[in-house]
Regions:
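Glycoside hydrolase catalytic-domain context in secreted enzymes
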Residues: 1-94
Length: 94
């Protein structure tokens, strides 16, 4: 991805999606996350960002902690995540 973007003259990619997918979430249905395991998602997102940087493309990981639990896409509707701070820290911010 990084090489292709660099060859096209792109120097910033609003990626990777670093959200931890929740059961039945829009991001999981759309295949837009690296999975449901926080540690695996962190490793994959870090590797993706490193690959971009190696080609001279800056990475901007997204979205916000908890968004992986959203049932609808933020492209289609506003989303409210009703998780406690402890729940976010325990799953989405490890």
């Amino acid at each position: 991805a990084g090489r292709t973007l660099r060859e096209l003259g792109v120097n910033v990619n609003l990626a990777p999606v670093a959200d931890v997918a929740g059961p039945g979430s829009a991001l999981a249905r759309d295949g837009r996350t690296f999975g449901t395991d926080p540690a695996a998602v962190a490793r994959a997102a870090a590797a993706f960002a490193a690959g971009l940087r190696a080609e001279g493309v800056a990475a901007a990981a997204k979205h916000f902690p908890g968004l992986g639990a959203a049932r609808v896409s933020t492209d289609d509707a506003p989303v409210v995540i009703r998780r406690s701070r402890a729940a976010l820290r325990g799953r989405d911010m490890r």
